[in-house]
């Protein structure tokens, strides 16, 4: 049985033109891509390896900078090896602390310098303790010298904490006594400084003063410390000491004092003498220190050989020293 023939469409639909170019594009898209050559693949792999190496180098360089800049990471750098995650965590904690404090100290060079100085001192203290433990052994833990040394270093480390505001013109507290501690030929100067309470007791065993009786001395400016030690520097130069002794020697005068117009130097000595008397650590007399008293004086109530009280000789030596130091 034959199937009935369907009616054909219009002539325009059957006789329409066929687009050959569109079929060519479809055939090209369906065609698989060509595989690259082996030389191109090797060049691409090499370029990718170079880029990856540069990226790792930048990461490692940034992490090393963070180890150096973050104080907590810098403190743990010598003891153990830090991982990258630990360095990043310490950096995050440090930035959080800076944000919590309002950013104070981030651009303060002095605060950062003092912080790194205290960190370095604590590292050295740890090494000293470890060295003493290895050298002396566990049996030397009851040694009094070792105990005194460690307690002194611990107290010094506690005092080295950075202060919020600078106390002087210098970035670090001045400690000018190291020159005098290294000079064994100056026992009189060390005794005078110990009497005045300006030398720590671990340096001078014979002094029973506390370790640091004057806390403000550690942060004293260099100008004040230099002014303190200038008068005692006369002991180092024997020629100047002899000249001061000759100046302090009483002059021969007649028994009846002749009225003389007061000179400018006498006026200065009259103004300076009460100040020196009030600021002197010890009363004038035979118990004074040898650096300032050139001639032993008798009782202050008895007149001197030239008809003057004995205290005038001491004031004269003080004034001569001060005027000579001012000229020096």
Swiss-Prot record:
TM spans (from-to): none
Example GO molecular function: DNA-binding transcription activator activity, RNA polymerase II-specific
BP-aspect Gene Ontology terms: aortic valve morphogenesis; atrioventricular valve morphogenesis; cardiac epithelial to mesenchymal transition; cardiac ventricle morphogenesis; cellular response to BMP stimulus; endocardial cushion morphogenesis; epithelial to mesenchymal transition involved in endocardial cushion formation; glomerulus development
Biased composition (Polar residues): 24-42
Region: Disordered, residue numbers: 1-57, 239-308
This protein's GO CC annotations: chromatin; cytoplasm; nucleoplasm; nucleus
Claim: DNA-binding is one of the keywords in the record: yes
Subunit structure comment from the entry: Self-associates. Interacts with GATA4, GATA6, HES1, HEY1 and HEY2. Interacts with HDAC1, NCOR1 and SIN3A.
Protein name: Hairy/enhancer-of-split related with YRPW motif-like protein
The organism of origin for this protein: Homo sapiens (Human)
